[in-house]
Amino acid sequence: MLIESADHDADLVTYEPDELHHVMRFALGCWQQMIDSQQYRSVLMYKNKGPLSGGSLVHPHMQIVGLEQEDGYVSLTSANFEGINVWQQGRAEADLFADAIQVALRYILNEHHGGRAESYNLFFYHLGGRTIAKALPRWVVSPYFVGYRLAQVNAETTLDVDAERLRAHLETLV
């Protein structure tokens, strides 16, 4: 568990740039240190925020979990990362990476679906020599998914509009 701030109401969304960069550099460094230790089969890093995120701790935190037996990536395929590519910046430095994450999270909480999301998950992956962040708004899970594993997805046009709006925010970073 990585506690981000002494401020109980703080979050990646609200941090000033210096604090955001410090937290993200520290988290990425701790994650890499656990990976480099070779004590674990895989090391996962993620963040839960909000009442629908699946987390239990309200204080701002990320979780870095070392799995001794399990491969946390075993069920991931390239299909998990398909869709509309909103932003890709080659080998972005950690501070720019943090800024992009903050922009995406602000978009999720303040603009996506009219700003109705109050929860999100943020996942980090090392894949293909790259570090990838995947931010997702969290909602009450549909009974279609719970009972039948059928996902309800937005229409392509809605996804395209969301992607374009978020892309416009991210393009201000470079």
Stretch-by-stretch model annotation:
Residues 1-174:
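HIT superfamily nucleotide-processing domains
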